[in-house]
Structure formats: C-alpha cells, structure tokens
Amino acid sequence: MRRRSRMLLCFAFLWVLGIAYYMYSGGGSALAGGAGGGAGRKEDWNEIDPIKKKDLHHSNGEEKAQSMETLPPGKVRWPDFNQEAYVGGTMVRSGQDPYARNKFNQVESDKLRMDRAIPDTRHDQCQRKQWRVDLPATSVVITFHNEARSALLRTVVSVLKKSPPHLIKEIILVDDYSNDPEDGALLGKIEKVRVLRNDRREGLMRSRVRGADAAQAKVLTFLDSHCECNEHWLEPLLERVAEDRTRVVSPIIDVINMDNFQYVGASADLKGGFDWNLVFKWDYMTPEQRRSRQGNPVAPIKTPMIAGGLFVMDKFYFEELGKYDMMMDVWGGENLEISFRVWQCGGSLEIIPCSRVGHVFRKQHPYTFPGGSGTVFARNTRRAAEVWMDEYKNFYYAAVPSARNVPYGNIQSRLELRKKLSCKPFKWYLENVYPELRVPDHQDIAFGALQQGTNCLDTLGHFADGVVGVYECHNAGGNQEWALTKEKSVKHMDLCLTVVDRAPGSLIKLQGCRENDSRQKWEQIEGNSKLRHVGSNLCLDSRTAKSGGLSVEVCGPALSQQWKFTLNLQQ
C-alpha cells in the first residue's frame, strides 16, 4: 500500500512537472490567456489583428530560428557590430568642411545610430496588407566608391533590420576601388554580408554586374549606398516579381535631407520620366490617372522610367535581357537604357507604393569622372539613344547639340541584343508607355520650354485673350510648353502669342491661332537667342512681367529679351 502511494505521488509530481514545462515553453499560452489577456479568454489565431499575427509569426518562427542559428567564424549579428570603431576613424575633424568628402553633411550622418528610427511613411492600407508567405529570397547588391561609412553602415543595417531574415539570402557589397579598402572589408564581419573589391575603378554598371554575377539568390535587389529601408519594404517588391518575372519594380523613394538627414515621405503621385534632353525627372500623374486610383491608392504604378538606384528584378531575366551596357562608364544614362530595354523588349516597370526606401539626394557628385561628368553622361546617353530611340534620337541631339561631338564607342553588340530579343520600336514606347511626352510636330522649328535664365515663358493658366508671363522653370511641360512653327507661330496647344498693338510696350496676348495672321508671326534672330515679331520688328521682352505681363520692345542687348527653346530643330 505504501509502495503504491509512493508511486502515485511520483506520477502526480511528474504530471505537474510536465504541465509546468508545457506552460513555460509556450504550448499552453492560449489556455493561460497570458498576462493582461482578459479574464482568461482564449485568443483565437483567426481573431488576431493581421499586423500582430505577422509579428507573432516572425517572432515565434523566423527570429527564434535565426537566434539559434550558428554564425560562421568571424561573423557577428548586426546589433553586435561596433559602430563607433567603424565610423570613428573617418569622422570629420573640427574645422573641416562636413560636405567636402560626400557632398552631404557627414557630421550629421555620423551622429546617427546605425539603426535609427524613421517614420513609417506607407499608406494605412499597406500597414494592414498581408503578403505571400512563399516569397523568394533575394541577393541585395550595393555598390559604392568612397561612401561615408556611417551612411553605408545604415544602408546595410536597415536591410537586415527591416527585412524578414529568410528573405535576405545575402548582401553583396561591391567596393568600386575606394581609397580605403577597409570601408567595405570591415563590414564583411556582419552576418550575410559579402564584400567584393574591384582592383580598378569600374563604375556603377560594371560593378553591379559583378555583384549580380556573384549573387546566389534567384532575385536581385539593387540599392544605392546611402539608403534607409522602411517597414516591410521588401515583401511587396518580391511579391510583384514572384507573380511575373518580367516585372522590374521600384519602391517609392523617400527623401533623406542632405543637410540634416531628416527622413521625409515622398508623394505617391509621381512617375519617372524625362524630357528630350534625356535627363530623368519626376512627373505627376495626370488628373485622370489620380482619379482612377482613388479606389485603390496602393495599386502598382506603371512608370515609363525608373530612377535607377533602387529596384528589384528576377536574376535570370536580368541576364536574358542583357544585364547592363558594359561599355557605359562610371554613372549616368544606365537607368534610361534599362528602362527602354525592359519596356521595348516585353517587360514592364512599376513603382510599388507599399514599399518605401529613403535615399540621400545630393546636388552634385562627390567623386570624379574620367574626362568630366558632362562628357561621361553624354557618352552613356548617346549609347542609349543610338540603340533604342530610332529616328527620335534626333530630338535628343536637338536638345543637346554638343552631344553629337562626344564619341560613343561600338554599339554593335547592343544592336544585336535588340534584334535577338525582338524588341519593339521606340514609336511603340512613346504611344503605349509614355504618351504624356510631347513629340515635336514635323512643322516645328523649335520646341519645348522657352527659357530665360531660370525662368520660362508661362501661360500662367490663362486662356484666350489672357496675358502671358514668366515663372520658374519646372521642366514638366504644361503651361511652359511652346513650339515655333514653320509658319512662324509661337504656339501653346491651339493658342498663339499675338501682338495686339504694334507699339513698343504693348502687352502680348494669347489668342486662337489663325493662318496668315501677321500679328502672330515671329522669328528667331541673333543665333536663336531672341524672338522678333515680324510685322513690328519689336522683340519679346519680360521687363514688364511683374506689373502685368510680357510685352514687345525695341530690340536691344537687354537680358529681358534673351530667350532660348530647349529644342531647336534647325540649328
């Protein structure tokens, strides 16, 4: 009897111990209700808020697995990386120009934590959205040359901190022959970071291709070296590529102020575009496009062009499509070339509103270009224009006449690539992808903005019988888009500049264009630097712009009479 009692007590003890272990290990948390769980109520998984559910999934699964994972010898997790030791040796000394090295305020950059908090700038709908659980992992390729260590470190840490661990296969840093090899080498201690160093300066395109060739994941993510990734930035990008491997997708690029490093959310109503000078610009969506998105403001945005610094792409599609033009140098024009190539060869470009990544926008480059930045950009741009733009390349040469004098090298392999991929003509691109870009008419002598210094001729929103004025050039067309025709009319849509009174000081009016109306006849004189009214021999003048509008005055050397079209089609 005593023996049986002893056995029962032992069994009871083991049973209690087992229950305690079960509760402690989390298996009975639903039964226990948890601290503050509310009167022992069971928390049903289907009733948990989606965001909380996602966090629970990560914390109970991926992060636990990551914490148990053994790191390779010499590697550390990013929270254990010594930021002070890495950044400290390159900090700006007292009296030094904080902008000298990087063309942004390095002192402010160096003050920030490598994992600083930034505002979540996503739309509310994005914060409630659930992403596919079977997304492919990505290799993140970051190229740099003499980047500020604090900015480079924040880029790497933000990728690791703001991404589900299982979606980051690796971060490949390609050091494009920086002066100090340790800028990259020291970061190789961080988990998942691989460092490749060029043995000479190669430039952005060839460096990115080297990183892509070394990548082990099926999806490539290209980032600049002065970025900060926002909450759940990666999942929406990977999801779009997983659904269609011919999509090339970019986040909304938020602004990191170059002076104080404040993080500011960018508008979600922008698309990438360009003028005929082939310089990238941001275009606002048309009112019709904005209205069509009111029901789903976080839907992907088809964009004619990507900025080029930040995008995600299927690795095999990147290879099939011809990677980058390896004959392009340093920086510039590569986003133009890859955008044309993707669209014309069967792919598409998208901006994904639920993905946000901050980027430091600078006013000038901190590094040197062999032969000068203008020459390198013109050479790269000419290569893109000659391969992809067909006869429309002539509008580029009209906008940038000096580009004709810049040798662009051999493009035979790129022309063969275009033929092999059965790519569409540029006319198709203009009609189907970028109809907003105005194409000069065959009757036009000059086209585009009519510039006077930093100001441009502007309708000021006026219509028939309204005056015209000048306004700061915005490079967005619209009220500042004009054409000088072979019939000598200065046109804005169906309205023409009209001299109502042929006396000096008379205001110019917008009136409906009429054939053979002498009041609407203009010609360019003095090397296309002035506009003279044919009937009165008076010149277009802006001296009275602030007091009422533009006028005609006796032609003279005044700066108020200097005007230049962005495209002169007859040089």
UniProtKB/Swiss-Prot annotation:
Binding of substrate, residues: 143, 176, 201, 225, 331, 362, 365, 367
GO MF terms held by the record: carbohydrate binding; manganese ion binding; polypeptide N-acetylgalactosaminyltransferase activity
Region (Catalytic subdomain B): 300-362
Cofactor(s) of this protein: Mn(2+)
Record note on what altering residue 282 to A does: Loss of enzyme activity
Basic and acidic residues bias spans: 53-66
Pathway: Protein modification; protein glycosylation
Annotated site (Not glycosylated): 516
Positions carrying Phosphoserine: 536
Residues covered by the Ricin B-type lectin domain: 443-566
InterPro entries to which the protein is assigned, alphabetical: GalNAc-T (IPR045885), Glyco_trans_2-like (IPR001173), Nucleotide-diphossugar_trans (IPR029044), Ricin_B-like_lectins (IPR035992), Ricin_B_lectin (IPR000772)
Membrane-spanning ranges: 7-24
Domain comment, as recorded: There are two conserved domains in the glycosyltransferase region: the N-terminal domain (domain A, also called GT1 motif), which is probably involved in manganese coordination and substrate binding and the C-terminal domain (domain B, also called Gal/GalNAc-T motif), which is probably involved in catalytic reaction and UDP-Gal binding. The ricin B-type lectin domain binds to GalNAc and contributes to the glycopeptide specificity.
Name of the protein in question: Polypeptide N-acetylgalactosaminyltransferase 2
Organism: Homo sapiens (Human)
Name of the gene encoding the protein in the UniProt record: GALNT2
